[in-house]
């Protein structure tokens, strides 16, 4: 209930909770976020009618604040369906990562509305497959590729800082706009607030027993990226957090105690969600996602007080612990911290077929998890098809029974 003693912020959050309670129950909210990628097609169309620029992206390394500062809408184009892979394989090798083939296939066949709406596609020199795929994408749309260093040294940071400035200048010339430092700093504050809100949300799974399924948590984390109004997003997330807490207080044993699983590895979504479902259908709870859709994209913030805003943005994004980095200590640091904070019983690493950097790095992750953290580890290599669902269930059941 609202109280006269409430601060304006408390009143705002409570009103959002009340509105949410009137309109929707938690399962409906989870499903709504899960369908956000599809539901936002219409919103994207309406924004295009207002001549709002669209920037299509493929990676967590993309410095969103720069594009948002010019008033653009930023949308992820990574596809997670095998629908267009046969079309992609007419141009690309079959033994290529399904994420790359799917993304290219949707662009080539014009089946992705977000690609259709995008005025400019921005990629980064992450993995070799993506770098070459961007060259072919340039046949369909204007593509700008940022030169991402593959290390996190001081020299690499300086290069990445320069690349971010070059990207700003590209946007200014391409769209005939001026991007001010004040606009960039405003978006830094907004995106930091989004990261804090998402972190508050997924941190709920530190509770034992868990207040939600990993499948539902992933729907929010994945769907939030397709909420175009970043200023209102933190309020929506925090209203959901409050609602989950309220329901948990009434019924903390909704989900019985079970082995607590952390999922790491490649970006997952769409077809790759089958791994999460297999874990939870066979007696485990996914309580944490370390990968691109989870903690990896929210854990670090941009330093708001650094006098050099480009250096601050460069530091934040370059510190992301992706397997394209050599060496990659930040992934181990984050992984170790999450294992401790979430009281993880086992780690499941999900890698996509032909994703060489993540597949090669599984040995180092296995050693870290089993030897340094002393908990079980399992690696799963998959793609976007449904052909291995039976095998996945069998493997997960045996692994979780062992726990």
Across the structure, where does each feature detected by a protein language model lie?
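Acidic/His-rich segments in extracytoplasmic proteins that coordinate ligands and/or metal ions
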Residues: 104-172
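Redox- and metal-dependent alpha/beta enzyme cores, enriched for Fe-S-associated oxidoreductases
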Residues: 66-80, 87-88, 266-327, 331-334, ...
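Peripheral docking tails and interdomain loops at the edges
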Residues: 22, 363-403
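A charged, amphipathic alpha-helical module
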Residues: 18-53, 165, 169-286, 290-298, ...
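Structural motif
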Residues: 54, 119-120, 346
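Short, Lys/Arg-enriched N-terminal segments with co-localized hydrophobic residues
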Residues: 4-19
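An N-terminal, globular interaction/scaffold subdomain
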Residues: 54-111, 126, 133
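A short, acidic, amphipathic alpha-helical segment used as a generic capping/interface helix at domain edges
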Residues: 107, 326-343, 361-364
